[in-house]
Structures are given as C-alpha cells and as structure tokens.
C-alpha cells in the first residue's frame, strides 16, 4: 500500500467558489489536469486554465435541469479504481476511464435554503445527489484519492499543496476522508431533520452543528451543545451561554409556553421560584419576584410579553443570568444592557422537537415530550363541593407549574401567583411542608390558596396538612387505591378537589 500519491487529475464541482482560486492556481502549476461541470468549469477557465467538461468525458450531456451531471461510470470508475489491483486497472483501460486522484466538492446549501424560508420545491432542489455520491466514493477510496468535501477544507488542502506540492500521504488522505464522512453524515442528518420535523425517535447530530461550551455542568467537565440556537434566539447582549444556562433556558421555554395570559417566570435550577400572570409585564414581574426574591438571585427570567422601560427599571435592580422575551423596547434594552455579562435573548418562532432523549447507562431513553395541557374540560370534580370559577383558574395555573417542576412536586398558588413550591422531594408530604414553610417565610397568607400535585396522593395526609393551613381547593391526577379516603376527608372538611387523570412526573 503506497504512502505517497501524486495528483494528476482533479475533479472539481463546487457551490462556493470563494477561496478556490489559490488552489486551482497551485494545482495548475503542479501540472494537474482539471475536470469539471457547468459553473465550476467556467470559473476555472476564467482564471486562464484549461478544464475538460465532464460531458466530454462521459459523452453524455447534463440532463433533467442539471439533476444528473456526474453520475456516470466514467466518473465513478476513475475515482473508485484501486490502483494496486490489476483487475481494476485493466477495466478502466478497457473502457478508457481516466484515474481521478483529487475530488473537490462543495454541496448545495440545503440548511441555508431551509433557514431562508424557501418553498419546499426550492428546498428539494437543494438536496445534492451527485456531490454527496462523489464525496462517499472518493472517501471510500482514500488509499488512492484525496477528497475535499466542503469549503472548510479548502485551506487544509492548500496548506498541503504548499508544503509538498501535488502529492499526499496516506495519513492526509485518511484524515480528509474522515472529514468528508462528517460532512456527508451531517448533510443527510439535516435532510432527515427537515422531513422528520421532530417526529422521529432518533436524535441525529454531527460535529458540524457542535458548539463547544465553556464547560459542562461543573468546571471540570467538558460540555457541548448540538443544535442551532440561532434558530430559536437572537442574543443581543451578554456573555457566552453556558451549559447550565441552557438547561434553565430549556425549562423556562417549556414553562412559559403553557400560558396564554401575559406571564412572567423566574427559574432556578430548572424549577420555577416565581411566576405570575398579570395585565402588564411590570405587574407580572413584581408578583413573580415576590414569590421568592431570594432564589431569584442569579436566575433565568422569561416572559411572553414585550419588556418596556418601566419593567426593565425594576428588573434591573436584581442580579440575574439570562432574560428571554419576544421583544424589548429601545429604552428597556439600554437599561438591561448596563451589565456586561447579562445574557439578553429575543425569542424567535421556532418548531421544537416532540421527542425527548436522555443518555444513561450504555444507551439512550426516548419518550414523547409531555405536551398535554389540561383545560377546564379535563377537570373531574370528585368532591361534594365544586371549586369556584376563581379557584378553577388558580388550579389550572398551578397545575402548569407543577407539571414543569421536579418530582415529587407540590405547588401552592392564589390569584394567578405562585406562592411557593416544594420540588424534588422523595416524599410528597415533605414537598408540601417545604412549600408551606417557604410561603410563610415570604409573608403569604395561605387561606383561600389552591394546591397542585404532579401525582396522586397515596394517603390523605397531604390534604389534612393543606386543610389546616387554609387551602381550599386541590388539583391532582387521581388514581390511588386510597383515593376514596382522600375524597372523604375533603368532603368532611369542605374542601374542593378535582382530578385530571394525567400524571406529570418529571425526573
């Protein structure tokens, strides 16, 4: 197996021609002959260098509006021929197929076309067929052929040519083949993701959409994000988004999307520590902050309303990591941008995946995202006393928060304001006690408040504790074998309870 290979013939067919001129010039100086198609051939000839048309080699014209140009045995035979196999050499000589030693390809910009909002017909036309086939063929035969599969690889090729002329080592060819397969796998993943639109049970990513983060969950851990944050947000101020920021941003987006009313939420470690629905952003912020002004320090803020100057002046009084809104007025941005590192995001309209993935052990868990949002129609009153219209509003309000809180979770709310929550507890009773203690520590009166639970009550103990604190209405999934005991206690003490039939565990 020969280490060094000389480049005698290069097939060049690219979309992006910026940076190609230096390569073509150097190759010509090294005596390399060119083979190309359409626009690329015209580009090479415009530089003053001869270039043979693919059609002249194949004796077959480009057909179907350019859909079929290079897909021909005289092209692929020249790429895939194994130079150390006598049988291959005999066949290409018999059919007068020239050996192709270098393939330079740059694929149609499929992702950019999708991002531009183009029609499906235009998007389909940007699915490269010949180019991806050339990449795979040349990469497969890296023992004899060097492949440049994207504009990003123009410089490595030029550096190689400048270092030792039109020759390549096996190590260089193998490295370029690896990069080529990274390009082809990413390209196919992008096409799959377009057609799948988040429906599939497989998560596909590649190094092409990898973003290295400052670190992972802790400084001693490396961290990466695979995806396209630019499709979801415009970052208009602040430092680089961290691994932990992304976790909280994800939780914040999931939570705020539950609400149609103007709402402001404050999150810390993926859980809401403040949330309120109000007529204005300023009012919503003020009451959300009142829920837990201590935990709000260093949190992630999100609203579904436009942040104005009045709201920004109040928000600016505390330290926080990230703020997300659909828009900000000019004065608000000037105020919020006073802190250099503060991350300010404008949220865009973007389709989110319907599947969730979690790596564990030696595999990956996949599940449907919990997209169920209970409404009045889903509530079943299981007590003699029905909740009042105001209590129903609060129950649904609280249920959305508990759905997005770590289990076991209890949420206490009143007047469309989060009073307190107990989250991530091994006991539902402990979660309730935590919520009660927290609400009292910030001066909230629990009389007339409602309680939401992410799962059923195995015993009546939680409603007994809630009753003693003045809580008057409860929402829970139901389904315990001892539901009747819980319902009976509520009836005896004049409490209203509704069940939804939907559990919202979150681990």
Swiss-Prot record:
UniProt cross-references to SUPFAM superfamilies, sorted A to Z: Cytidine deaminase-like (SSF53927), Methylglyoxal synthase-like (SSF52335)
GO CC list: cytosol
Chain ranges of the MGS-like domain: 1-149
Pathway where it operates: Purine metabolism; IMP biosynthesis via de novo pathway; 5-formamido-1-(5-phospho-D-ribosyl)imidazole-4-carboxamide from 5-amino-1-(5-phospho-D-ribosyl)imidazole-4-carboxamide (10-formyl THF route): step 1/1; Purine metabolism; IMP biosynthesis via de novo pathway; IMP from 5-formamido-1-(5-phospho-D-ribosyl)imidazole-4-carboxamide: step 1/1
Keywords: Hydrolase, Multifunctional enzyme, Purine biosynthesis, Transferase
Catalytic activity annotation: (6R)-10-formyltetrahydrofolate + 5-amino-1-(5-phospho-beta-D-ribosyl)imidazole-4-carboxamide = 5-formamido-1-(5-phospho-D-ribosyl)imidazole-4-carboxamide + (6S)-5,6,7,8-tetrahydrofolate; IMP + H2O = 5-formamido-1-(5-phospho-D-ribosyl)imidazole-4-carboxamide
EC number: 2.1.2.3, 3.5.4.10
Any one Gene Ontology molecular-function term assigned to this protein's record: phosphoribosylaminoimidazolecarboxamide formyltransferase activity
One Pfam entry name: MGS
Keyword Hydrolase: yes
Keyword Repeat: no
GO biological process: 'de novo' IMP biosynthetic process
HAMAP family: PurH
Name of the protein: Bifunctional purine biosynthesis protein PurH
Organism, scientific name: Bacteroides thetaiotaomicron (strain ATCC 29148 / DSM 2079 / JCM 5827 / CCUG 10774 / NCTC 10582 / VPI-5482 / E50)
Lineage, opening ranks: Bacteria, Pseudomonadati, Bacteroidota, Bacteroidia, Bacteroidales
Gene this protein is translated from: purH
